[in-house]
């Protein structure tokens, strides 16, 4: 198979049939974009500069915030360009790079949530050994493994995109590049590119979810063995924020997968809207979840803006 010699650009798509409303759709998406940047940026700033937050739990939270920022910064510039400027053209190289980062960061987010579940598991099940198990070095190693696993797992299918000829329509179905959209336009044998992502989905994302699920069964079993009701509530509260983030991420994954697999007769705009929800809702919600449910983050925000706060 030779290097791709077909036309060098793809055409991105906003909301088909709603082109006259693109400027209005741009406004809430821009607001969400700014909120995500501010929310996750604030979390990263707090964790970096507040010594009270220099603990494994918050280092993992910083990884989640950085991943969410990465997803947003990768997808939203082309979305806003399409909606406001009608800038639909994107080169093959830029498109494939965008697809690589979008899919890598999605797998990485699943890995970070698994790492956070491990942190919660150690906190509840082995509190006396917590500091000896989750040292700064160990946290760094976990972060590198999560990043490496995600980056290497996505690379094979994206590398192959550079070699496919594209002789069909060059119009993509979203305002950003996704692997599954691009391969539909290829005039070549795409069997590997169809099957490999399914393997990644089951071997990584689904496996991550199952490990998280069973770890929380063990956590719940430990918590239920605590005699005091107050201590049980305190122990559960330790992991409430993480549980909320897990639900936000995996529910959107399940909904998006369901729509793509079984929604053949669903209007295309529903597919597009669900994609935006999948990529924007978790990064938008995660900072709010941790700000509302975690007292240390609340205190850090109040200190950042020099507001008096109760120590109760």
Swiss-Prot record:
List of glycosylated residues: 4
Keywords recorded for this protein, A-Z: Cell membrane, Disulfide bond, G-protein coupled receptor, Glycoprotein, Membrane, Olfaction, Receptor, Sensory transduction, Transducer, Transmembrane, Transmembrane helix
Record carries keyword Protein biosynthesis: no
Sequence intervals crossing the membrane: 24-44, 53-73, 98-118, 138-158, 195-215, 236-256, 272-292
Name the UniProt record assigns to this protein: Olfactory receptor 51B6
Native species: Homo sapiens (Human)
Function: Odorant receptor.
Membrane topology summary: Multi-pass membrane protein
Ranges in the topological domain labelled Extracellular: 1-23, 74-97, 159-194, 257-271
